[in-house]
């Protein structure tokens, strides 16, 4: 199943917490997504795979109301397409962009304090630092004193105290050392065990395979493949072909 046929034929899984159907989206005047459909069941890690320019980031931005889009986007049974981004965030959806957005002039502790609480049930500071022990030792360091891996950890950590339980993570392993990537994978598995739902954008299939329950492969703005984790081994070469430059 490939191309436009997959876009139309890949239904969202039953009881999806997030359901995207027939989504078209634009980045400026460029028409990036064409009839994209996918679903994210509660408590799962779902990965959007694809090479640069496939439309993965645009899909996340469309969910957050940051780009022009049409189609259907529902969260917990409620239509969110057309809502202001702050209202979408208020539903418990948090977006961690690839550029991380760490405030470099603020300390780690100040960065952690900055995001507003949107819902009850956020993780305590103590639990957040248990998940990211590197940050515990650097609470008084400014953002510009952190390594790339530590900045990524901080960008993710800031979400956890807000009460958001649905995380959109854009390329969290991009440019990071293997040992840091392993640590991020371990943290995502812990968050999943604690009830978080995660939509992940990745090009790193080796990493995604350690955390994901299902994969949607985007190619030229369309869903080319939907692969449950149980089928990845048998279809890995085909999936990898969509990631080759």
Residue ranges: model-predicted function:
Residues 2-5, 11-245:
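Glycine-rich phosphate-binding loops of nucleotide-dependent enzymes
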């Amino acid at each position: 199943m490939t191309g436009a046929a997959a876009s139309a034929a890949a239904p969202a899984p039953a009881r999806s917490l997030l359901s995207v159907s027939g989504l078209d989206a634009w980045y400026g005047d460029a028409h990036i997504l064409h009839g994209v459909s996918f679903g994210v069941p509660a408590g799962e890690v779902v990965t959007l795979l694809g090479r640069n320019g496939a439309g993965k980031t645009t899909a996340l931005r469309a969910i957050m109301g940051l780009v022009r889009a049409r189609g259907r986007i529902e969260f917990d049974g409620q239509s969110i397409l057309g809502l202001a981004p702050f209202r979408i965030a208020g539903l418990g959806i948090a977006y961690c962009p690839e550029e991380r957005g760490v405030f470099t002039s603020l300390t780690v502790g100040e960065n952690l304090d900055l995001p507003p609480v949107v819902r009850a049930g956020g993780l305590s500071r103590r639990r957040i630092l248990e998940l990211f022990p590197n940050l515990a030792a650097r609470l008084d360091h400014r953002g510009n004193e952190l390594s790339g891996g530590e900045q990524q950890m901080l960008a993710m950590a800031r979400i956890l105290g807000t009460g958001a339980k649905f995380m959109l993570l854009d390329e969290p392993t991009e440019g990071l050392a293997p040992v840091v990537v392993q640590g991020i994978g371990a943290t995502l598995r812990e968050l999943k065990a604690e009830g978080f739902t995660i939509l992940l954008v990745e090009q790193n299939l080796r990493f995604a395979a350690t955390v994901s329950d299902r994969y949607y492969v985007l190619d030229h703005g369309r869903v080319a493949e939907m692969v449950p984790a149980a089928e990845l081994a048998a279809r890995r070469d085909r999936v990898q072909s969509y990631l080759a430059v």
